[in-house]
Amino acid sequence: MSLATSSSMAGGAAVVPRSATATTASAFVTMKRRATAVRAVHAAEPSKNPPVGVPSAAKTSSPSVAAPEKAPVAAAPAPVAPAPAATKQVAPARWAVDSWRTKKALQLPEYPNAAELEAVLKTIEAFPPIVFAGEARHLEERLADAAMGRAFLLQGGDCAESFKEFNGNNIRDTFRVLLQMSAVLTFGGQMPVIKVGRMAGQFAKPRSEAFEERDGVKLPSYRGDNINGDAFNEKSRIPDPQRMVRAYAQSAATLNLLRAFATGGYAAMQRVTQWNLDFTQHSEQGDRYRELAHRVDEALGFMSAAGLTVDHPLMTSTDFWTSHECLLLPYEQSLTRQDSTTGHFYDCSAHMLWVGERTRQLDGAHVEFLRGVANPLGIKVSDKMNPTELVKLIEILNPSNKPGRITIITRMGAENMRVKLPHLIRAVRHAGQIVTWITDPMHGNTIKAPCGLKTRPFDSIAEVRAFFDVHDQEGSHPGGVHLEMTGQNVTECIGGSRTVTFDDLGDRYHTHCDPRLNASQSLELSFIIAERLRRKRIRSSKLNNMLPLPPFGV
């Protein structure tokens, strides 16, 4: 369910890594965790509760485990028929909310005080869910549209949220840029845009190195504000479980504000001309956006004259969902609840979760956890991904081949995209699997500037163009874009129409992790994408023997 309709829901009682190599999940926490079924309580939606292609938990007095795939579940008796696939159906192993602890886990911290960690996790287990199952199901339905080319996913936000930069203005500005980008993409593509934020929970970050060394001093790497601090001292870098409680509180507060923005009038379409940020006003992108906003205003005037007034709910609110990387598994487990209407488990820390490039091992702890939760899932895929491995991973996470369940987030670099992506698309198509393909043009294009700071050239982010070219070639649907961006006027990525240079990086380089697009660069990229969507729409119209509307005045 979207934020726009969340008011109809009733809430339930609302380390220092030893090495950079894998640790076992069982070594991560030595104490036994309870696997009791905790139900998320909300308004029943029988019509919106189709069974999901993931294991459901058996309702017993013993620790909850998933029933075999063929066993019927009382709350969801009608199984979804899988699409034809080349792979043989194999009954999945039994799943429980803590079965990931039997698998090898990468990128997890080791907390020095096991008793304190246990107490914190029990506290979070008792907290209300941050999101609701019905909201996640509604997002899955929308993502299914994107898989079929009927919608476009815009997913964006901070590389890593921080405690220090947590304030309402930053949340509002990022939300506002996403609204602007959505308006541009909707106008260009003439299709709905699904808005999903990397917000309200995007704290933990995987690291390529377990330790960081400065001036001969070696300390554990910073892994995100919900794990340890970024200050380079021993006390700050020790993983602190209390940070998970603060991350929960910040996530809940962020989502509360986002709900207010989405449904309280701020996102009303008639405010389209007011969304421009001050520092983008006198720029090429600001001028282009004002021109587009004027055309939208004219369209709204026509719609009003036709009877669709500006106070209609479609015009005064918007749908907005949240997402983050599923990395810190103890936290994710503590916020997993059993949905009272379907019996399925949902990770109620976010509407959508994704598994990262470093943690997507077929037999790993993160994949084991995610296969049992019914949220829509993303899979980060680099040029290292083997087509056969991708097909197997999709089969594990979506054995019933449910549309909208799986989003493939490609991050390869422009040239690798043209070489590698076609083979992945063909393999998935041959297996009969339904996925939503989107591009992450950020992670495959990170470089180090002469000053030592990480940056990303805006021109290299033209990986987006390669993404569209490949899908045009393969006859598949380019379903969306995934961006690390901010509404702040930062100087972290070089290039763009306002020409941020290497020398400018130090002016406003505020990221706690990786460089982000600023508002002007984000808007510029949305115009590039909108033009590709427009061209695709025109080609599709011609193929269907439909002529596009003539220019105004003809």
UniProtKB/Swiss-Prot annotation:
Its EC number is 2.5.1.54. Pathway: Metabolic intermediate biosynthesis; chorismate biosynthesis; chorismate from D-erythrose 4-phosphate and phosphoenolpyruvate: step 1/7. Residues 1-39 form a transit peptide. Coiled coil: none annotated. It is an enzyme of class 2 (transferase). One of its GO terms (molecular function) is 3-deoxy-7-phosphoheptulonate synthase activity. One of its GO terms (biological process) is amino acid biosynthetic process. InterPro entries: Aldolase_TIM, DAHP_synth_2. The keyword Chloroplast applies. The keyword Ribonucleoprotein does not apply. Keywords: Amino-acid biosynthesis, Aromatic amino acid biosynthesis, Chloroplast, Plastid, Transferase, Transit peptide. Residues 41-70 are annotated as: Disordered. It is found in: Plastid, Chloroplast. It catalyses: D-erythrose 4-phosphate + phosphoenolpyruvate + H2O = 7-phospho-2-dehydro-3-deoxy-D-arabino-heptonate + phosphate. It holds the Pfam family DAHP_synth_2. One of its GO terms (cellular component) is chloroplast. Belongs to the class-II DAHP synthase family. This is Phospho-2-dehydro-3-deoxyheptonate aldolase 1, chloroplastic.
